């Protein structure tokens, strides 16, 4: 009787030093016994960890993709990394615009901003000074060019210089004519007066003066003998006087 009852403490599936037959009666099947094989699986710890997280190995990637909270957090982290990278690039570019003495130092972002704010007004003053210097140089260059151009054209201008004539009406039958001429030209006022007398004008008075340069000035006071035959036109008279002067000049050349 005692041989058929198993001991109180079993081996719980661990190999026993005794024969299995000592615990079973004749004709009993070993597979139908009352004792269970309690072997510990090798993946117990992994399975336990997965079960505690509620995610299986095969579906872990799908669960992350389908979890909006996790996806949102990952996207936020990626955006934050990109934002910081762009900010660092911008501040690096700003730092490169500072003077060389400041670029050699490892400046923090606040220091970079502070030095940039101080450096901007200095650059603005430098730009103003450079613009002013440029304008001064342009004025000097332009003046030099004008002088050279005038110097080249001066002989030709003197050779072809003409007198100027202006007429001013004083009354119904009186007019004052002013003539300006160069002294280097051969000019005879008597020849001009002879021409205008033929046109019906009478000389009342004449005066002349000289300037410090090569200029002669004549002032003629003329009257018209017959107002019925001639109406004073100052513009036409000026052109007539200039024509007579040029005619006299050519006759002397």
Curated annotation (Swiss-Prot):
GO terms for cellular component: nucleus. InterPro entries: bHLH_dom, HLH_DNA-bd_sf, MASH1/Ascl1a-like. PROSITE patterns: BHLH. It comes from the Eukaryota. SMART domains: HLH. Induction: Induced by OBP3, auxin and salicylic acid (SA). Repressed by jasmonic acid (JA), UV LIGHT, and heat treatments. Up regulated by iron deficiency in roots and leaves, as well as by nickel, high zinc or high copper treatments. Repressed by high iron, low copper and low zinc treatments. GO terms for molecular function: DNA binding; DNA-binding transcription factor activity; protein dimerization activity. Keywords: DNA-binding, Nucleus, Transcription, Transcription regulation. It is found in: Nucleus. Roots. Pfam families: HLH (PF00010). The keyword RNA-binding does not apply. Its main location: nucleus. Residues 71-123 form the bHLH domain. Homodimer. This is Transcription factor ORG2. It comes from Arabidopsis thaliana (Mouse-ear cress). The gene is ORG2.
């Amino acid at each position: 009787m005692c041989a058929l009852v198993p001991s109180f403490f079993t081996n719980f599936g661990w190999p026993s030093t005794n024969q299995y037959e000592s615990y079973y009666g004749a004709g009993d099947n070993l597979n139908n016994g009352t004792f269970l094989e309690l072997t510990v699986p090798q993946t117990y710890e992994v399975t336990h960890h997965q079960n505690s997280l509620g995610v299986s190995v095969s579906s872990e990637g799908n669960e992350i993709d389908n979890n909006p909270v996790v996806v949102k957090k990952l996207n936020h982290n990626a955006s934050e990394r990109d934002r910081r990278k762009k900010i660092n690039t911008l501040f690096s570019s700003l730092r490169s615009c500072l003077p060389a003495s400041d670029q050699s130092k490892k400046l923090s972002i606040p220091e970079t901003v502070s030095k940039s704010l101080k450096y901007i007004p200095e650059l603005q003053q430098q730009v103003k000074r450079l613009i002013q210097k440029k304008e001064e140089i342009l004025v000097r260059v332009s003046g030099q060019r004008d002088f050279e151009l005038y110097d080249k054209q001066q002989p030709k201008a003197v050779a072809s210089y003409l007198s100027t004539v202006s007429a001013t009406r004083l009354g119904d039958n009186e007019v004052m004519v002013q003539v300006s001429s160069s002294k280097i030209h051969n000019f005879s006022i008597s020849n001009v007066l002879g021409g205008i007398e033929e046109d019906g004008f009478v000389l009342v008075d004449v005066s002349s003066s000289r300037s410090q340069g090569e200029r002669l000035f004549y002032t003629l006071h003329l009257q018209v003998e017959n107002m019925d035959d001639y109406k004073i036109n100052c513009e036409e008279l000026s052109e007539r006087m200039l024509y007579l002067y040029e005619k006299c000049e050519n006759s002397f050349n």
